[in-house]
Design a protein with these regions (language model features):
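Active-site-proximal flexible loops/turns
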Residues: 22-24, 60, 121, 125, ...
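Short, polar/flexible loop-turn hinges at active-site or ligand-entry regions and domain interfaces
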Residues: 81-85, 132-138, 187-192
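Short alpha-helix plus adjacent loop in nuclease-associated cores
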Residues: 144-168
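Short helix-coil transition/hinge motifs at the ends and kinks of transmembrane helices
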Residues: 62, 129-138, 160-167
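Acidic, Mg2+-coordinating catalytic module of metal-dependent nucleases/exonucleases
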Residues: 109-116, 120-121, 163-238
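Conserved non-catalytic scaffold segment of RNase H-like nuclease domains
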Residues: 2-119
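Substrate-recognition/cap helix-loop segment adjacent to the acidic, metal-dependent catalytic center
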Residues: 116-145
């Protein structure tokens, strides 16, 4: 860990990869098998970076793991575990470790791209493993903030982004982390790794770019702002 400058404000950026159960298709019932997180200041400087596979899911739920959206990446995980470049942690151990890091850096804000997903699946996992004896992954009072909403407010409404006019089949602008990082880094063919820590570092740079705009941003993970770019574009060409 770098020396802590107590004059700075630090935030935690987290990203998870999940496998899906079939408990209830009406809500997100994914369970986390990969956690990556880092501690950053508002300029995107990194102070802590960690990544784990979660033992109770990755090691003990073999059938479930085959449902993982990126199951084809599993051989990479096995190789990294074998050569020692990746570690395994229990979900309770991960929770305790992250809480300690947050205490050390006086962190009260956790950021993620589509943060509702990360929070829900982390809570799902701690409840699944502890049989609901523990119900929440982050310490009480933690503010969960959404980088996606922030990016939609201040990056994806920029004229240069809108003029690129990259949309999905429904006519909405593509605003996922892969697309936004490609935009701010001028890499039109950028592809996200979809491995916890690697994605964290990308999302931390998007977050820093958002902060650098010095504009009002929506951070609530339960408010959807992905329609904003289309609305802004329609105003621009009217």
């Amino acid at each position: 860990m770098k020396k802590i400058d107590k004059r700075k404000k630090y935030v935690l950026v987290i990203d998870v990869e999940t496998a899906n159960t079939i408990i209830d298709s009406k809500f997100n019932d994914g369970l986390v098998y990969d956690i990556g997180f880092g501690v950053y200041d508002k300029k995107g400087n990194e102070y802590v970076a960690k990544s784990w596979t979660i033992k109770e899911i990755f090691d003990k739920e073999e059938e479930l793991m085959q449902s993982a959206y990126y199951a084809w990446k599993l051989p990479r995980y096995y190789e990294e575990l074998k050569n020692g470049t990746r570690q395994t942690m229990t979900i309770k151990g991960a929770k305790k470790y992250i809480a300690k890091v947050m205490e050390t850096y006086n962190i009260t804000e956790v950021y993620a791209y589509n943060a509702k997903f990360d929070k829900q699946t982390l809570d799902n996992t701690i409840r699944f493993v502890t049989k609901s004896k523990e119900r929440y992954f982050f310490p009480y009072g933690t503010e969960i903030k959404d980088i996606w909403n922030m990016a939609c407010c201040v990056l994806c409404t920029q004229k240069t982004f809108l003029k690129q006019n990259i949309r999905n089949d429904k006519g909405n602008f593509i605003t996922n982390a892969e697309r936004v990082f490609g935009y701010i880094s001028c890499q039109s063919d950028f592809e996200e790794d979809h491995i916890g820590l690697q994605d964290v570092r990308i999302e931390a740079q998007i977050l820093a770019k958002c902060f650098a705009q010095h504009k009002h941003m929506e951070t609530n993970p339960y408010h959807a702002n992905w329609r904003l770019p289309r609305k802004k574009y329609e105003e621009m060409v009217a």
